[in-house]
Amino acid sequence: MTWLSGLYSIFVASAAFCSLGLILVAVILLSRKFLIKVHPCKLKINNDDSLTKTVDSGKTLLSSLLDSGIAIPSPCGGKAACKQCKVRITKNADEPLETDRSTFSKQQLEQGWRLSCQTKVQHDLCLEVEERYFNASSWEGTVVSNENVATFIKELVLSVDPSRPIPFKPGGYLQITVPPYKTNTSDWKQTMDPQYYSDWETFHLFDQVIDNLSLDTDSANKAYSLASYPAELPLIKFNVRIATPPFVDQAPDPTIPWGVCSSYIFSLKPGDKVMISGPYGESFMKEDNRPVIFLIGGAGSSFGRSHILDLLLNKHSDRELTLWYGARSLKENIYQEEYEKLEKEFPNFHYHLVLSQPLQEDLDQGWDKNDPIKTNFLFKAFELRQLSHLPNPEDYLYYVCGPALHNSSILTLLDNYGIERSSIVLDDFGS
């Protein structure tokens, strides 16, 4: 009976510990409810009384404006990384945070410039907001499909109300709002081709529980470049790469969370509803008739596809267009059949695919591992095949989008050839 009494003692102690934990959680929640008082605050915008908004205190300025129908862009999801949610507070600005100090000059800080994603609304404020943000709207989209187009990249296709078309331009982006959610990565197999299972299994990425039920909605918005072009409405498309934790011993680090927005998108199934806002963007096509070279990697495929299909299929442009797309292997290549078809149909479009790590199955299909134009880093292949042979490389436009290392390598290469920054259009968050 001794072992039974010991087991009983352990059970009682465990129950007491769990009960204490629940009591502490309840105390914290009640304290927040009664000690943190929420009060109304007025946001006077552009010195126009008709634009004054009344919001609850405690939220970020970014979230408060979004709730009031003013969609300030925040491509990074409110993490103070993209620096695009700038707002000038002309009256009652609080002391700048470190994120503000690293973003604005001393003079700008004195003028009241702040990052709205970091500024908490605690009292009445007077603001200056660019008028273009008043034109941004929200839509509800319905998931049509959400299939993997590469091992870690999905093509999310949404349908929006055709009576309210989204007035976006190629190169633009929309923000996706993420509600509280919980998902198990094994459920993502429902929208994943089995050819991608093995890599996910190798890195133990299935059967991972991602719990964001207590999500702070202030940080639950992220921007994604559109892969579709306007003529495809009411369908809109995105290419989204999953943000996994770093790998430790071929498994995701359990101490690092999965990407909030990308995990939400990977969990979506046909029929699900998604809230989107926008449109935003500055990486549009320059209408000066210069030839365009697209230097695209990974999920930057969104940015490239939107521009290229609009130029060829919608505008019927005769501009010389060249696409260089970089992927690890043929399994990771996106939109190959579509681009090969366009290349046959349009003599002014040229498509180059570069693989950095072709698989044995790629070599078995005839991929030339020893050809530096086909098997290489994209920026090296591009220089060997095209850039070094251009008599006047400064006469071209260069549209760049991809992972951070891809972007930095391309920008360094172009700078080495004397390409002015004004001839480069960079989408730095599309991947």
From Swiss-Prot:
One GO term in the molecular function aspect is:
metal ion binding
Q: Known EC number(s)?
A: 7.2.1.1
| Entry similarity comment | Belongs to the NqrF family.
Membrane-spanning residues: 10-30
- 2Fe-2S ferredoxin-type domain location: 41-133
User: How is this protein named in the record?
Assistant: Na(+)-translocating NADH-quinone reductase subunit F
**Cofactor requirements of the protein:** [2Fe-2S] cluster; FAD
Q: Name one GO cellular component term.
A: plasma membrane
Q: Which residues form the FAD-binding FR-type domain?
A: 136-286
One GO biological process from the UniProt record?
sodium ion transport
Q: Which organism is it from?
A: Chlamydia trachomatis serovar A (strain ATCC VR-571B / DSM 19440 / HAR-13)
Write out the function statement from the record.
Answer: NQR complex catalyzes the reduction of ubiquinone-1 to ubiquinol by two successive reactions, coupled with the transport of Na(+) ions from the cytoplasm to the periplasm. The first step is catalyzed by NqrF, which accepts electrons from NADH and reduces ubiquinone-1 to ubisemiquinone by a one-electron transfer pathway.
Identify the keywords attached in UniProt to this record, alphabetized. 2Fe-2S, Cell inner membrane, Cell membrane, FAD, Flavoprotein, Ion transport, Iron, Iron-sulfur, Membrane, Metal-binding, NAD, Sodium, Sodium transport, Translocase, Transmembrane, Transmembrane helix, Transport, Ubiquinone
